[in-house]
Amino acid sequence: MPLKRSLKESIERLSSFQSKYNIFTSINPSPYSITNKKGTKETLTGCVASIKDNIVTKDFPTTCASHILENFKSPFDATVVKLLKQAGVHILGKTNLDEFGMGSGGVHSIRGPVINPLYPHEDKKIMGGSSSGAAASVACDLVDFALGTDTGGSVRLPACYGSVLGFKPSYGRLSRFGVIAYSQSLDTVGILSKKINVLRKVFHTLDKYDMKDPTSLSVELRELIEGNKKVRRPLKVGIVKEFSHESMPIGFHRLYLSLLEKLINLGLEIYPVSIPSVKNCLPIYYTLSPAEAASNLSRYDGIRYGYRDSELDIKDGILFAPTRSKFGTEVKNRIILGNYNLCSDAFKNNFIKAEKLRVNLIDEFDGIFRFPNVLTNSKGNPDGLDLLIVPTSSKLPGSIRDFEEEEAKSPANSYINDVFTVPMSLAGLPSLSMPLKEKTPIGLQVVGQYGDDSTVLDFVESIS
C-alpha cells in the first residue's frame, strides 16, 4: 500500500483525488487488497500500481479514452501486466490519457482532462500527456508506480509536470504485446514512480524477451549488451548545444546550474556536444508517427470490435465512416495527416526522406557515445560520452483553458512540447526524466546509448 497508509485512509484519499483530478478510467472494486504472497528482494510483492488505459487487461475495460473502444474488454492481459501480477503487484486501476496516446496535454479524453495535482485545483493546470493519469496517480501517492506508454515523450513530459520520475527504456526492452498501437516503431512501455529503487525493480521485472512481440529485443542482443558493460570512470556527460535553454521556465537555470555543480563535485566530466540532426526531429516525428497511426487505426471498422452504430440502416459502403466518426478531433487530425504522408507524392517527398533523416540522427548519436549500439553494429566512440542531460520541457504547465485555446488556433502549437523528448524516441534511446526540485514541474532528462539503460538508472540513483 503506498506510503503504508491504513486501508480506510487510502480508499478515502483515492475517492477524493479521483473526484478532483480525474485520474482513472476504471478502478479495482477492491482497491488496496494486497496479496498475501511472500516477496523477495527482486519482486514487487505488496506494491500497488496503475496501468495506462491503452495497455490491455482482462480484469478492467481498455478504452484508450475513446468512444470507439468505450466498452471493450480484452480477453487477455498484456505481457507487462502479466509479469507484474506474477511478481505480486496489486493493480489499482486504469489511468486516463489522451485518446489513443495522441496528445501532450492530457486533455483529449472522453473522460475529460486530467488536472495537475501540484497546483490548487481551481487553477486547473494541464498534467501533460499522454500518460497524464499515470503521472497523476504517482504524484498523488495513490500508487507505488505506474505503467504508461511513451511514443514521443508521453511518459517523460507528464512525469516532469507532476514532479516524479518517468523512464522510457530502450525501444524493444519491454514487451509491447497487449499495448494498443499508436506508432509501432516508436511506442515504448514506460515506468513512473517517485522512488528510483522502485522504478529500477519494475524495470528488471519487465525487462524480458517476449516471443509474442516481434519488436522485442532478442536474447542474443540482450546478452551482447550485458557483455559490453564495463566500468567507465569518470563518467562523461554531454550537454547538447542545439537545445537552446534561452526560453526555459523561470527557475530552470538556477536548478540546472546547481545540478551541474553537483556533478562536477562528484568527479564527473561535462562536455558540450553537437547533434545537428536534432533540429529535424519534430518534422521527422510528425511525418512518421501519424502515418503509422493511420495504418494502425484502420482496424477500427466497427465489425470485429469497438463501436458500431446499431441504428444504421446498413447499406453497402456506409458502415465504415459512421463508425470512425467516434474518433476524437486530435485522432482524426493525425489520421488525415498520416494518410496524406502515405499518399504517392508525399510518400516520396516526405515519408522516405523522414526515414533517411531518422537514420542520420541515430548515426550521430552512435558517434558521440562510448557504449556500442548493438542494433547498428556501432563499435562505440572510445573518447565519447556516457550520458546526455537534456531539459524535459521548455514550458511550465499552463491552464487547460489556455492549452485548448492555443490548440484550437493550430494543433501544431501543442506539438512544440515534444521538442526535447522526440529525438530520444526516434533513436530508441533510454531516457529518464527526473525533477530538479521536489514538487516543482521542472525536469531534466538523463539519456544513454541504446541498450545502456543500467547506466541511466545508476546515474539517477547516485544523485538522488
UniProtKB/Swiss-Prot annotation:
Quote the catalytic activity from the record. L-glutamyl-tRNA(Gln) + L-glutamine + ATP + H2O = L-glutaminyl-tRNA(Gln) + L-glutamate + ADP + phosphate + H(+)
Q: What else is known?
A: Present with 486 molecules/cell in log phase SD medium.
InterPro entries registered for this protein in UniProt: Amidase, Amidase_CS, Amidase_dom, AS_sf, GatA
Q: Does the keyword Mitochondrion apply?
A: yes
* Keyword Protein biosynthesis annotated: yes
Q: What is its main location?
A: mitochondrion
What UniProt keywords are attached to this protein's entry?
ATP-binding, Ligase, Mitochondrion, Nucleotide-binding, Protein biosynthesis
Q: Subunit structure of this entry?
A: Subunit of the heterotrimeric GatFAB amidotransferase (AdT) complex, composed of A (HER2), B (PET112) and F (YGR102C) subunits.
Q: Which PROSITE patterns match?
A: AMIDASES
Protein's name in the database: Glutamyl-tRNA(Gln) amidotransferase subunit A, mitochondrial
Task: Specify the superkingdom.
Answer: Eukaryota
Give the record's family classification.
Belongs to the amidase family. GatA subfamily.
The active site of this protein is located at 52, 130, 154
Question: Tell me, what is one Gene Ontology molecular-function annotation carried by this entry?
Answer: glutaminyl-tRNA synthase (glutamine-hydrolyzing) activity
Where found?
A: Mitochondrion
Q: Under the cellular component aspect of Gene Ontology, which terms does the record hold?
A: glutamyl-tRNA(Gln) amidotransferase complex; mitochondrion
What does the UniProt record say this protein does? Allows the formation of correctly charged Gln-tRNA(Gln) through the transamidation of misacylated Glu-tRNA(Gln) in the mitochondria. The reaction takes place in the presence of glutamine and ATP through an activated gamma-phospho-Glu-tRNA(Gln). Required for HMG2-induced ER-remodeling.
Give the enzyme's EC designation.
6.3.5.7
Provide the GO biological process annotations: endoplasmic reticulum organization; glutaminyl-tRNAGln biosynthesis via transamidation; mitochondrial translation
